[in-house]
Amino acid sequence: MGDDGVIRQANRDDLDAITAIEMECFGDSLSYSRKQFRYLLTKAHSLCLVEEKDGVRGFIIVLFRHGDSVAAIETLDVRPSERGKGIGVRLLQAAEEHVRQHPGIRRIRLEVSTGNETALALYRKAGYRVTGRLEDFYGYDHHGSRDAYRMVKDLAAPSGAGTHSP
């Protein structure tokens, strides 16, 4: 794929680009603020990856809770002008690889609008399954619906990982 960018850990220098992409995807009133992204970026129990080629084109944020066996995808955003290039797929795969490295994490979950057919197709193709419907999850109209599906994926251990416990 000649259009592949570099996927890397996000840093504070990416805040403006991340915030701008969020605004492009969700509009002013529905977006996370720069302050919220700064918190998510620097929070000890989170992962933020960006995909970059001539600037940041997309990002994913995954949250971890101490002692929990489930990681949560908080958001996966790709610039509307860059969609259809596999950026979301690559970000999702990279995030899953990072999550597999966390001891005790066995599953990854997310919520997605019941009306967001593109995202639903992406997640289904990646092996996520719907486990429930959350009514009025968003509290506002999001892709033509206020409801969300909860989706989960069971994660296999990282390649070469043994089952021996110390």
Question: What is each residue range found by the language model?
Answer:
Residues 99-111:
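Conserved GNAT acetyl-CoA-binding A-motif
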Residues 1-2:
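Short, conserved catalytic or adaptor-binding loops enriched in Gly and charged residues
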Residues 78, 113-114:
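Short amphipathic helical patch at the helix-1/turn junction of helix-turn-helix
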Residues 5, 9-83, 89-102, 136, ...:
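Acetyl-CoA-dependent GNAT
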